[in-house]
Design a protein with these regions (language model features):
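Protein kinase-like catalytic core scaffold
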Residues: 48, 91, 109, 169-172
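Catalytic-loop of the protein kinase fold
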Residues: 146-163
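Regulatory N- and C-terminal appendages and interdomain linkers associated
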Residues: 1-15, 23
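ATP-binding glycine-rich loop module of kinase domains
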Residues: 18-89, 93
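C-lobe/activation-segment region of protein kinase-like
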Residues: 163-199
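Short, glycine/acidic-enriched loop or turn micro-motifs at the edges of active sites
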Residues: 115, 157, 175
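Conserved alphaE helix
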Residues: 130-144
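Conserved structural core of kinase catalytic domains
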Residues: 92-134
């Protein structure tokens, strides 16, 4: 069975959630250049794969630190994640973590990898009560972002993770969202409400 899917039970018991690994799909292409620097910071590079748009159910993938990322395409999106992380309520963090070297000096940010299942998977497996709970958190987060004129731009259910540690995580904000995408965010949320029976 592929990672990220639910294990269905043949009995009347509800399906057991199977953990999958998801990452923000912002990872750096300059792997050979970054690997020595990451090793210096004590990061396990055997678990870090440098590729853009790694398949969703791949093994754990780490992203590069923003100050070392040279790609003109990746830096704006990384900055967007950091910007949104500062605005979203602490109970609904975006997956950004500070990184320090062995001396404790701040180095930059790295995007963590997350274990959990997507909102898409919850809906597909008819776990609608949990899907509604996750969606309520997303709505609260998006309202706060929109109040600050910040738009996510891609609120599809595959970009919402119900993490195994209890968090709800938003993935993959568009790097250059247009103001009119606020309406797009709202329409996507309305569609998700219908899918989970929240209306």
């Amino acid at each position: 069975m592929p990672l990220g899917m639910f294990r269905r039970s043949s009995s009347s018991n509800p399906p057991e959630r199977r953990s999958s690994i998801h990452v923000v799909e912002i990872v750096v292409a300059e792997g050979a250049e970054l690997k020595p620097r990451l090793l210096e910071q004590g990061l396990d590079c055997d678990e870090i794969v440098f590729k853009y748009h790694w398949p969703r159910y791949a093994p754990p993938v780490g992203s590069g630190i923003r100050s070392l990322v040279k790609s003109e395409h990746l830096r704006p999106q990384f900055d967007r994640v950091v910007e949104m992380h500062a605005l979203v309520p602490s109970s609904i963090p975006l997956p950004v973590a500070p990184v320090r070297n062995p001396d404790g000096d701040f180095v930059g940010y790295i995007l963590e990898y997350i274990e959990g299942v997507t909102l898409h998977e919850l809906i597909a497996d008819r776990m609608l009560a949990e899907a509604r709970r996750q969606l309520d958190r997303v709505v609260q987060a998006v309202e706060k972002l929109h109040a600050k004129s910040v738009v996510h731009g891609d609120l599809n259910p595959a970009n919402v993770i119900a993490a195994d540690d209890g968090r709800t995580v938003l993935l993959d904000p568009l790097p250059f969202p247009k103001p009119q995408m606020k309406l797009q965010d709202e329409l996507l949320l309305e569609d998700l409400r219908r899918q989970v029976g929240a209306q």
